[in-house]
Each structure stands twice: as C-alpha cells, then as structure tokens.
Amino acid sequence: MSWKTMYRSFYYQGAPEPEDIVLNAEETALLVIDIQNKYMDVPDDPDENRRWTPFFERMNSIVIPNTARLIKTCRQKNVEVMFARIACLKEDGRDRSLSQKKPGWNYLLMPQNTEESQLVPEIVPQNDEIVVCKTTDSALTGTSLRLILSNMAVKNVIVAGIFTDQCVSSTVRSLADESFNVIAVEDCCAAGLHELHEKELEIINMIYCHVASLAETISFIR
C-alpha cells in the first residue's frame, strides 16, 4: 500500500486518492521535533525500563537513523532543515506553558543550556540551520517559527520527530491551520506506544497532513 491509501480514518475511508505530491525544494522545509537527549535516557526503574523498551528500540533502529538520512537528503537537495526542541529560558521554568508545569509525565523542566535539552548527537544542526526552543507542544505556538517560514517563502513542511501523538500532532495541526502543506514521515516518528503512533497518524492523515514513508517523502522532493 502507498501513502495514498494508508492510514485512512473513518472520515476518509471512501475519499478519492489524493493527487501526486511534488515538493519544490525552494518552497519546502524539514522540521525535526524534540529528538532530544532527555527522551533517550533509559529509566532506572526496571518496570519503567521494560515499559519503554519498544520505544527505545524503534528510536535507535528506525527513527533516529531514518531522520539522519532525511536530514542528509534535504541538505543535499537544498531543502531548508530546521529543528524544534523543548527548552525553557528561565532556570526555574517560570516561562513554561501550563501543560509542562502540571504533575505527571509531561512535567518538563529543561533549561536551554542543559545537556538533556540538547538534540541527540546523530541529528545536530549544521551552520546556520534554525533551531527554535519551545515550552509548548506545538512548535508554532510561542515561537517565531510561523513568521520564519513565511519570511522564507516556505509553503511545504516535512515533519519528523517525537512524540507522534503529542508535539508532532500539535505542530502538524498548527501548520495546517496556518495553510502550510504538511508531510508527516511515518518512519521518522514515534510515540510511547506504537499503537498510539499508528492511531494518531490515522487521525491526522488527509485533513492536517499527508502521512508518507521516508522513501516516499524523498521521492516527492524536486
């Protein structure tokens, strides 16, 4: 099955196949979301370790290598490469959004200069590639990314990163609402559970973005 027929939600099961996608390099940007050291730290607790093992396996064997390949290809094809990472400006995190202050897994206190807030070594930015710091789920909310994309005449955004059902989904929806054409690269994304990853891609596909594989996405770029 191709991207034209995969990840069909209830609402789009009978919809016609979309037209072929052509991404002109000068009008396209790649946005890599939140692939940070924090999320590659293996939990000390044995139960949590076991619970998160499938996620770490997918990240190490699929998502990070594929994202590195996608970045390399975009650089070669003169597609603008951008990054978003969760990082607060204040050491005590007072500038964070409420969603990152609430107790639980989503409580995040990562000042911008800490090691855990940095992008993983396999996908570090080069030269003047843009990195936006956010304390929100969406990479557009609370950053200048929307204005940056507009100023650079970007119309198409390729999205990779984590977590599919959280920051990736929020960013994809924001981009769609701002009238960008969005491609979510399935095998460059992950969620805590693969079931959550698959379901969220089904939910956002064809309304907020088109979901495609790495190989398909590369073939779209002209």
Regions found by a protein language model. Give the residues of each.
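Intrinsic disorder/low-structure terminal segments
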Residues: 54-55, 82, 162, 219
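A substrate-binding/cap region within the structured catalytic cores of diverse enzymes
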Residues: 96
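A short alpha/beta connector and helix-capping loop motif
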Residues: 26, 42-74, 79-81
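Active-site-adjacent betaalpha module
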Residues: 1-29, 38, 43, 72-77, ...
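Short hydrophobic beta-strand that contains or immediately precedes a catalytic carboxylate
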Residues: 31-33
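A basic- and aromatic-enriched beta-loop-alpha substructure that forms the phosphate/nucleotide-
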Residues: 82, 86-88
